[in-house]
């Protein structure tokens, strides 16, 4: 294995790669080129994504003073009349029941998530619109205007009109400090526009058990305003190095590599892959996902939607390599969950930074937070772990996902809007 190759590849990939954009396509072609350079064929698989077009958005405090606050529109949430809606304002904290009993005819703000359940409760109680937040309390003026354009994932049967906007948490703080009485929201959009995103897929056939497949996945898209070096250029180059490893050391089992597009808008690339390859899923013995590796000053994590013995083994092998892993069982918000929801045992490696450490989903996610030695260490470990699974004498992976995980399957689908 070529030392620091992963870090050098990451430098080439560290640019904004938003779902459905030309830059995401540029990154996809870069990944294909990297595979082909090592003699592994790769191809792009396209899929459709929602791409709601926001044509007008604003949020204005009208009483007790008049002041505008920067925001972006929530795609697919709904829309106001052309002239907007003016209504009393209410802050509902994280949307707990204690705070939403008297929201009729109001525009509400939550610093929690606008879940499908909360959306329904607010609509049923007569709320007219909502504000959600993004970013941090201490973000500077630049960050306060770098609010991404996100869209909601309403429930499958939800055709309601409930317009929403998003603002930076610091901006929201300033709004609350004005003791708002009434606000005016304007949101106009076209909900029906579609876009195109892509997965990149490569494969090396196994020489002994080609019918048994291990899939390595990582999303390669980023959010707006971010180079996405940590999230998730790092995971993308990790599986590229695993691909290098098996190109140089032919595997007993087939290894497949899926660089997923559009993870940042709801696991859409991995979900599309599973739906486009339904018949092939039965041959996948394990999905190993990588989301955020090799950052400076962070703890290593391993997550499992699979038999706990696999996760315990990963943690044990980490000890042999002098690496500690915190572990957790269940569905996690990354592409491994798409596989697990389609009954493929799945796991994911990642890192978590301390409070005040490296950030994701902002302009601060750059190469400055990455460390070539940290990345090299985790890449070498992951290649060794991958080899253990791929080259095992017998398939070591139980095919059943434990019931204490699958009991939350439908709720997880609902959470991510995966149908």
Range-by-range predicted roles:
Residues 1-23, 38, 45-47, 140-143, ...:
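N-terminal capping segment at the start of a domain
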Residues 2-22, 32-42, 107-112, 129, ...:
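Catalytic-core environment of secreted peptidases
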Residues 3, 8-107:
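Noncatalytic luminal/extracellular "stalk/propeptide" segments of secretory-pathway proteins
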Residues 14-22, 32, 108-113, 160-162, ...:
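Second-shell loop/turn segments in exported
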Residues 69-156, 161, 325:
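Extracellular/luminal Protease-associated
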Residues 71, 75-97, 148-229, 244, ...:
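Soluble metallo-hydrolase cores and metallopeptidase-like ectodomains found primarily
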Residues 244, 356-419:
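His/Asp/Glu-rich mid-to-C-terminal helical/loop segments that flank catalytic regions of hydrolases
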Residues 260-359:
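Metal-dependent peptidase/peptidase-like ectodomains
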